[in-house]
Amino acid sequence: MICSVQTLGITGIQGSSVVAECYISNGLLGFDIVGLPDAAVKEARERVRAAAKNSGLSFPTSRITVNLAPANLKKMGTHYDLPILLSIMSAAGSIRRPRSTSAFIGEVSLEGTLRPVSGVLPMALAAKKAGIQALFVPKENAAEATLARGPMVFGVHNVRELVAALNGEVALTEEPAWIPERKDSHVPDFKDVMGQENVKRALEVAAAGSHNVLLIGPPGSGKSMLSKRLPGILPDMTWEESLEVTQIYSVMGALTAKEPLVTTRPFRSPHHTISNAGLAGGGSNPKPGEISMAHKGVLFLDELPEFKKDTLDMMRQPLEDGKVTISRVVGAVTYPAEFMLVCAMNPCKCGWHGDPSGRCTCSDMAVQNYRGRISGPMLDRIDIVVEVPAVKFEELRNRAEAEPSAAVKERVDAARKVQNERFGEESGMCNARMGPEEMRKYCALDEASAALMKQAFDAMGLTARSYDRILKVARTVADLDGSETIQPMHIAEAIQYRAVNLGNR
């Protein structure tokens, strides 16, 4: 007898419909799973057999073949345990055949309890798209599944409970839609930072247009402290952005039953020893890397020159495209990677180059070699470069409260509102993402601004990409200023953010 049970698969963060087909036949005793399963799926044979017996079900002593269709799609993960078990029990006549409009997800333990799995939200969204009416998941994953706002979701504790429900002996209660609670944000505030007003202004401009930033300054000047406060002035995430980011964290298994939705902008700060796969994503079964975990948020790279050169250069394409593609023999996986890059570095190896105290022990050649670890093409993708001077004693002694993040955020929100009206709110585009067509339309310069731009282009030896970056930053400065056109003072401020000489661009 053949029986089919609906389930779901996942590739990257894209869910898809999968059918678990079971055929029980006479012949030598055996249990085979086909349909391009990975090791975790193949191991389901032992988990399913033990779970069935410990749940009071009679496991067939015949030849069992389970096919996970479509067979050309790589099947990865332990969430196939439950549909495999149900297809076998249905084919054996031990339980009622599940409806074709119901889908099942879950890992089973040897005693028959259902354990939470990763990637439930992308699969729930795929179930919604496929017209699935009822989705059965482990109880711990129920809140996450309801975020899809699609099929009815039923949280299940164990196999016994589910079998009783399928046989009509008990009725399961539909899970209510999870609604995020309003709570105070724990993001650090700009008011804690004394001085550094020029740097705060640069970060405000960066947040308003989603521009990439490089902070250069001696140890203890506040580079990390300022960067960690950047998410607090970014606009609140929309529902669509939260869902997109949550799908990435769901695939990584980084969600909890109490907090199934990511509602704050991510801030990721990997160590400079991180591998290429850790940063961009990878593995035999490709998983998202730090650049995808920072999607719609901030990726902070401290001690930038200490990162391996090939690791930094690998980020160049994701910075342009807003996504990263990982290719393997079985296929390619694409993860979103649209983030603000914030980097920090010392001006030299010892950290004190240019300090008035003369503490620097580095030669000019050593300074150039240190800064030269960052390639010119990588620096071209950074819109704003700003020096962070050492904090003066008078500023530390000043107990007057600095401007809070909430006040800065109001200005950033106003500038983003202008950009939403300009590009269309649904596009989610910011000034930093403008293409050639948008730049011709919204970054036109008058004669005075063009003359200033030409002077800077010739004097600073700018590249075409640097020229575009300056125009985009100037457009953001104008938006913060409430100006429809780019004025010379906006160009001047944008040029100021490219004036730091690193000797390699």
Predicted regions and their residues:
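Conserved alpha-helical scaffold flanking the Walker A/P-loop in AAA+ ATPase domains
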Residues: 204, 261, 265-266, 276-299, ...
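Catalytic P-loop NTPase motifs of RecA-like helicase/translocase cores
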Residues: 111, 301-308, 351
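Conserved inter-motif catalytic segment of the P-loop NTP-binding fold
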Residues: 239-275, 282-283, 389, 430-437, ...
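Basic, amphipathic alpha-helical bundle interface domains used for macromolecular binding and assembly
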Residues: 34-45, 60, 67-77, 285-286, ...
